[in-house]
Regions:
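Non-catalytic terminal/interface segments that mediate subunit docking, oligomerization
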Residues: 1-13, 21, 29, 235-244, ...
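A generic structural motif
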Residues: 13, 39, 173-177, 228-230, ...
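PLP-dependent enzyme catalytic core of the Aspartate aminotransferase-like
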Residues: 258-325
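Alpha-helical scaffolding segments of alpha/beta enzyme cores, especially the outer helices
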Residues: 24, 46-57, 187, 191, ...
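Conserved PLP-binding catalytic core of the aspartate aminotransferase-like
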Residues: 206-247, 258, 262-279
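Active-site C-terminal subdomain of aminotransferase-like
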Residues: 79, 85-227
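Hard-cation-handling environments
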Residues: 198, 248-251
Length: 325
């Protein structure tokens, strides 16, 4: 994009940014660095301030992917970590539904030095003019504002306005309680992680998976590698995910992040009860105890059986065909 090259910064053994590797590639041609914190392994980037200082030292900007903001809400902020711009995933932190491709919404926020570069027009407060005083609830009114260095409108320039309003209502309703929600999301993830290991040990199947990251405490999500199960029993992460559908669960994300072989990613969120987490852990182990041939056929009880996902991805059918086509 715009003639820039994307450079991937490797991780250390603990799953976090390799600061020395970052230093080795940074020069005055760097435009920005994009980071998710906590990262997709569920680990907080402890050296994020150092990374920000390195990028800023050459005039670059820091961009925050808000995908995992639910883990730190009320505890810290992208600004404190040194980020200059951020997009918030409203479907992951602020109550928006996210199924079937939408309605996703990712509002972008920037620090003051970038405000005049935002796409426009944007809504901004301005003094009241004329009869507007009859409708105003304070001494200001809202109007359109075109930032001085804006490129103007871009596609979907105001995004999904309904999602934004719902987010605002959610934020206003819970206020400081959002911090508690974040803490419960982290607590639930760590509780489930340890519950899975406990149930696996009790059932004698602890040799079927390992942690995706070497850490004592994760944030709002964690990963497991089913590589041992695949090597010993021919059971893949996809098989286990399909088996969980038969148990009545929405399956965890599989094969992401890519750095974890046969990866399953668990993000229980703050809304699940302890009883639900305990039952899920038991049912997960129940799936692991099934024979490989049974799991290869899963799901069995759902209205739609296992689909050929590779074929579906390569042969898109975006609408139902009419009879005369």
């Amino acid at each position: 994009m715009a003639g820039f090259e994307i450079i991937e910064i490797p991780s250390l053994e603990d799953g976090r940014i390799d600061i020395e590797a970052l230093k080795a590639v940074v020069d005055d041609t760097v435009a920005l660095m994009m980071v998710t914190n906590p990262n997709t392994l569920g680990l907080f980037e402890n050296d994020i301030s150092d990374a920000s200082d390195i990028i800023h030292s050459v005039g670059g900007q820091m961009y925050y992917d808000g995908a995992n903001f639910n883990a730190i809400l009320g505890r810290t902020s992208p600004g404190l970590m040194g980020f200059d711009a951020v997009h918030f995933n409203l479907h992951k932190t602020f109550s928006q539904p996210h199924g079937g491709g939408g309605p996703g919404s990712g509002p972008i926020g920037v620090k003051g030095h970038l405000a005049e570069f935002l796409p426009g027009p944007i809504v901004k407060k301005r003094p009241i003019v004329g009869d507007e005083a009859k409708f105003a609830v304070d001494e200001m009114w809202y109007g359109w504002y075109q930032p001085a260095n804006s490129i103007g409108k871009v596609q979907q320039w105001h995004g999904n306005s309904g999602a934004v309003i719902r987010c605002w209502a959610y934020y206003r309703r819970y206020g400081y309680g959002l911090k508690d929600m974040s803490e419960h999301a982290v607590l639930n993830a760590n509780y489930l992680r340890h519950a899975l290991h406990r149930e696996a040990k009790n059932a004698g199947v602890e040799d079927m998976f390992v942690d995706g990251a070497n850490t004592h405490v994760a944030k709002h999500e964690f990963t497991l590698s089913l590589q041992p199960a695949k090597e010993k029993y021919g059971i893949s992460a996809m098989d286990v995910a399909k088996g969980l559908l038969d148990q009545g669960y929405m399956a965890p994300t599989v094969y992401f992040p890519l750095v974890v072989p046969e990866c399953m990613m668990f993000e229980p969120t703050e809304t699940e009860s302890r009883d639900t987490l305990d039952q899920f852990a038991k049912d997960f182990i129940k799936v692991l105890q099934q024979d490989a041939e049974t799991l290869h056929e899963a799901p069995i009880t759902t209205p739609v059986r296992r689909v050929d996902e590779v074929y579906a991805a390569r042969n898109l059918c975006l609408r139902h065909p009419f009879d005369d086509e």
